[in-house]
Amino acid sequence: VSANVAPIEGEFDYIIVGAGSAGCVLANRLSANPANRVLLLEAGGNDNWIWFHIPVGYLFAIGNPRADWLLKTEAEPGLNGRSLNYPRGKVVGGSSAINGMIYMLGQAADYDNWRQLGLPGWSWEDVRPYFRKHVDHFLKSEHHGAGGEWRVEYPRLSWEILDAFRQAANEYGIPTVDDFNTGDNEGICYFHVNQKRGRRWSAARGFLKPVMHRQNLQLATGCLVEGLELTVRRVTGVRWRQNGEQRAARSRGEVILAAGSIGSPHILMLSGIGPSAQLSKFSIPVALDRPGVGSNLHDHLQLRMIYKVSGVKTLNETYASVFNRVGMGLNYAFRRRGPMTMAPSQLGAFTRSDSTQDRANIQYHVQPLSLDKFGEPLHPFPAFTASVTNIRPTSRGALALKSADPAMAPAISPNYLATPEDQQVAADSIRVTRSIVRQPA
């Protein structure tokens, strides 16, 4: 990892830990006021590798220490003791540099529920203006803005096999829609993607790079945060290791943790903020006993089903030909089109796992390809994959310290399929998949 080790002098108004999807936006917005001095810390390096910008580059980034934290879950009881890879971006841009590029807002009811739980200012109508402000969307409608930093485009290719699945979903009762981001995402359509003219449009490219000329904004890369500095239960600074040296910075305003659902609680616990029993186990002085730190982890498990097909093209047999692969490369190089612009999933759908659900509770990711697992070769036969996930699981996981060493990842336990409700939705969602593919289309 290359590191930006420019001198860090004086105090900052804001120190942001993590230059990922949230950190890049925060750095942009906070440094817009020239009176604010902002420091942005990132554990990874700069996004100057070509595969961070070619859409299919996630194939080379996930599982690569140049781009990925290489996290794994603990053995999952609900998955017969299997441990899963848990990709998280370790680069300027964070996971937006290696993810599926799908632009997806939540359901209006989800945001309204936050307000009902006691979060004023977080209802659907409250957050919509901010979504509109930051986006530059190809759809010109009341739901989307134009001219913002976050570019959203329609995918640059379609597949007959995916169109057939969409028709089958229509016959099952799932309507075709134009946009998942209107507040009610029930329906089926091609996913809209964070790309600009055929290139991945990460948070770094959209929000950070255009403002790096600001004299009041400083980015430091290769910074493994070791903990927060506290003064009488107030966070006043950050300490980190960079190029083998310990460094620190102080904040006269705020320290903002934007290190993600794993990194942020991990840093809190390393700093003595968390469950006292865990902290004491690793001889970390307890600054604030907070049992909730590291608990209540929500995650979505995808259930994949693969179907062999005939008489229709899929990526499996297309990619098998060397001639075709050369053509894909040339098509992308000269036209920014073709399979190299593909997101991991192209066609999406939201529907209900059974008739008792009051709104869509499962989501589909449909791909014109198949393989045994990520990173392995495509199958030698034509096939497509339909993955389905419960978007409101009731199972709750947790993470726990394994060591006081900041370089050692915490124990991650998503606790998939731990509740009868999630087990029922999983079974019902597979039945829905089978019902769709049995349609005449």
Where are these regions (language model features)?
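FAD-dependent oxidoreductase catalytic-site/capping-region signature
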Residues: V1-F12, R128, H134-T182, C189-F191, ...
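N-terminal glycine-rich phosphate/pyrophosphate-binding loop and immediately adjacent elements
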Residues: S2-R132, D289-G292, H300-V309
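Aromatic-residue-lined binding/catalytic grooves and analogous aromatic/hydrophobic interfacial grooves
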Residues: C24, G198, T356
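Non-transmembrane alpha-helical segments in soluble domains
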Residues: A27-S31, Y111-R115, R128-R132, D163-N170, ...
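Acidic-histidine catalytic/liganding microenvironments
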Residues: N33, H213-Q215, Q439-P440
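Glycine-rich loop(s) and the adjacent beta-strand/alpha-helix scaffold that form part
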Residues: N33, R37, G44-W49, L228-R233, ...
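Conserved redox-cofactor binding core of oxidoreductases
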Residues: R115-V235, R304-M328
